[in-house]
């Protein structure tokens, strides 16, 4: 159940933000060179590994009373199973209660919120997102510890 409508809304991307899409893609290309789109293989999305500190930081954000945290991920047009596999990944790594906070949308700009943590600033509607984009993997936010530091120092302090 979602009840905190006055909270700061934070969306978190999955692929190459929460989980290591790139490493799995490279490994599948090496292991199965005949497969043009590794992400089309059944089990690809469910088998992705979490990025370092991603789970701990996501849980920390979720535990802050002033934040309303959702996962906002785009589907793969190459793999219709990605919908169910991403849902299973969320349950396995973040718990069943987080499944209710999973949004799969091909256009991220349709969602209203304050922050979007994503490895891309465009391509799936991010460029139309009205809040602030926290570009994961950038020089300002190279990892999850820097993302947490931002929210600890900038956002939590401002609301205290």
Residue ranges with predicted function:
Residues 5-7, 66, 99, 111-113, ...:
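A general structural motif
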Residues 73-115, 122-124:
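Substrate-recognition "cap/lid" segment bordering the active-site pocket of phosphatases
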Residues 49, 54-84, 90:
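Substrate-recognition element of Asp-dependent hydrolases with the DxDx(T/V) motif
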Residues 26-30, 87-89, 131-135:
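Glycine-rich, phosphate-binding/catalytic loops in enzymes
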Residues 115-153:
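Acidic, Mg2+-coordinating phosphoryl-transfer loop and its flanking beta/alpha structural elements
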Residues 1-48:
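Active-site neighborhood of HAD-like aspartate-dependent phosphohydrolases
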Residues 45-49, 93-96:
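Short, flexible loop segments at the rims of nucleotide/cofactor-binding pockets, characterized by
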């Amino acid at each position: 159940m979602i009840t905190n409508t006055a909270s700061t809304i934070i969306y978190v991307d999955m692929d190459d933000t929460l989980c290591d899409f790139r490493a799995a893609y490279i490994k599948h290309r090496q292991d199965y060179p005949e497969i043009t789109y590794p992400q089309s293989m059944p089990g690809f999305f469910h088998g992705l590994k979490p990025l370092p500190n991603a789970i701990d930081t996501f849980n920390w954000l979720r535990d802050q009373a002033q934040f309303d945290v959702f996962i906002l991920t785009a589907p793969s047009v190459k793999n219709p199973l990605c919908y169910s596999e991403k849902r299973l990944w969320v349950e396995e790594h973040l718990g069943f209660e987080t499944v209710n906070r999973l949004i799969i949308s091909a256009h991220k700009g349709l969602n209203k919120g304050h922050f979007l943590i994503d490895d891309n600033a465009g391509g799936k509607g991010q460029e139309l997102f009205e809040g602030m984009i926290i570009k994961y993997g950038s020089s300002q936010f190279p990892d999850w510890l820097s993302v947490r530091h931002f929210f600890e120092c900038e956002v939590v302090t401002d609301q205290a």
